[in-house]
Amino acid sequence: MKASLLNKLDTLQDRFEELTALLGDAEVISDQTRFRAYSREYAEVEPVIACYVGWRKVQDDLEGAQALLKDADPDLREMAVEEVREAKEQLVGLESQLQRMLLPKDPNDGRNVFLEIRAGTGGDEAAIFSGDLFRMYSRYAEKRGWRLEILSENEGEHGGYKEIIARVEGDSVYGKLKFESGAHRVQRVPETESQGRIHTSACTVAVLPEPDEQVAIEINPADLRVDTYRASGAGGQHVNKTDSAIRITHLPTGIVVECQEERSQHKNRARAMSWLSAKLNDMQTSAAQNAIASERKLLVGSGDRSERIRTYNYPQGRVTDHRINLTLYSLDDILAGGVDAVIEPLLAEYQADQLAALGD
């Protein structure tokens, strides 16, 4: 194992011993805030230290077996050869596990998200494809037991959406969807195409982590223009009777968010403010993330909204993710919610990039 990793593990072990002592301290126990914080840190560190202790034991076993290779007894030497082989195999597995455990964790991975899908080039066909993408993510959310609620929608003239915004709530939503941001391209023959020519259209997807109250950006009310209007939608006794829909404009940046799905103006405003906070937070963090990704050439993690990340080719039944040169001939399954077929290889590639950087 590299000396840099050993140093990190030794430092972590010192911290683990310190945490063990702190959690037994009466003063800490009486302070629930500190006790909870130390308990969370202990729970994160303990599995790493357990693995490290196991690695050191196997390392000691290896050194003992290697010493027996010089023994005069041929039976002992033969036994030692097998023990050396087994110990080396175990060390490879334990080192790999420790490296993964030491990877920096994205603090946003456990968060809910705002999912934004917008039609780009391609007119009506792009709007229809936006609808296809939204159904794909909706089915994926359903498979994972997530809750999806539409915040705002602007339907296309011939189906689909010019724009649709949804909030997705559940376990590790951002951790799964964070690499879906970018330009998604579709190649297919539109229903209105009489000569069977393949058209190319595109949509952009943005996945924004929903900030919690502790990290939400403080927004000056003087920087906001708030407009109310009547929500549109299917008929019913509540439609068009109150100005429940909310449009908020952040004047310094020009960002506009709308929410019209709730019947309560108060709920729509709360959702819109949370979404605005997510967009402002994304503006602050994306530039830094892009700089890091460029420096380390982590194409998977750049999150550039203009970057073409994936092509859906209907005639060939093909989905290609251009960031990792992944091609799958399972278009129907993926559009039916089987997005893990693309997401899991992306996450694996990102982890491999992180491991490579860890060893630098």
Swiss-Prot record:
GO cellular component, one term: cytoplasm
PROSITE patterns listed in its UniProt record: RF_PROK_I (PS00745)
Family: Belongs to the prokaryotic/mitochondrial release factor family.
Function: Peptide chain release factor 1 directs the termination of translation in response to the peptide chain termination codons UAG and UAA.
Protein biosynthesis among keywords: yes
Keywords: Cytoplasm, Methylation, Protein biosynthesis
N5-methylglutamine modified-residue sites: 237
UniProt modification remark: Methylated by PrmC. Methylation increases the termination efficiency of RF1.
Predominant cellular place of this UniProt entry's protein: cytoplasm
Superkingdom to which the source organism belongs: Bacteria
Designated name of the protein: Peptide chain release factor 1
SMART domains for this protein: PCRF (SM00937)
Alphabetical list of PANTHER family matching this protein: LD18447P
GO molecular function ontology, one term from the record: translation release factor activity, codon specific
Annotated compartments: Cytoplasm
Record InterPro entries: PCRF (IPR005139), Pep_chain_release_fac_I (IPR000352), Pep_chain_release_fac_I_sf (IPR045853), Prokaryotic/Mito_RF (IPR050057), RF-1 (IPR004373)
